[in-house]
Amino acid sequence: RLSGTEYPQEVVLSGSHIDTVVNGGNLDGQFGALAAWLAIDWLKTQYGAPLRTVEVVAMAEEEGSRFPYVFWGSKNIFGLANPDDVRNICDAKGNSFVDAMKACGFTLPNAPLTPRQDIKAFVELHIEQGCVLESNGQSIGVVNAIVGQRRYTVTLNGESNHAGTTPMGYRRDTVYAFSRICHQSVEKAKRMGDPLVLTFGKVETRP
């Protein structure tokens, strides 16, 4: 954090998240957090103290890939994270959110944090994670908004029976039902057009 010389009460925040999605790239998130630190260090060396306060931030559990909760870091900045929402959640291995925080040296607050009112701007460097820039022969893009996330867990209940002897007309096959739901949902998303995106990210069948 570098304090501003003329407008110390106004903060330019820069950074990114340090978690990534399952099978994500090495540069997802972490690149932006490290780049912010390097940029501020270089700017201080070249130009001295900034006019406005500049602060680097690294946020965790933004993606929701480990725990069923997204934007934990950024929600806390704006006082939108309710500790009760994560107090009893666990990852796929049974590790609790609270224990994971403790392992990193943090404790879960008892109540939502006070939202910050000093942020003047937020600057983040991030890889595209897509193909639009490359397809258009562009090396960099500037955006002022990103997609929001909605995640749903859908349970389809069918009937388990012998796969080799149950006639097709007697089956209540949830995999077949899911395949139809998946196909129709994706086709509807295509008809609605950009910037809407839709993904079925995880499918489990039992038995």
Please name every model-derived segment.
Residues 1-25, 43:
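Acidic/His- and Gly-rich active-site-bordering loop/insert found
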Residues 1-3, 12-15, 30, 152-153, ...:
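Structured catalytic/translocation cores of nucleotide/phosphate-coupled proteins
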Residues 3, 42-45, 186, 205-206:
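Short beta-turn/strand-loop junction motif enriched in small, turn-promoting residues
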Residues 6-7, 49-50, 116-117:
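Extracellular/periplasmic catalytic domains that process cell-envelope and extracellular macromolecules
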Residues 13-15, 49-60, 195-202:
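Beta-strand segments within the central parallel beta-sheet cores of soluble alpha/beta enzyme folds
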Residues 20-90:
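A generic, well-ordered mixed alpha/beta core segment in the N-terminal half of proteins
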Residues 61-62, 66-207:
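Midchain, well-structured core segments that form catalytic/ion-binding scaffolds
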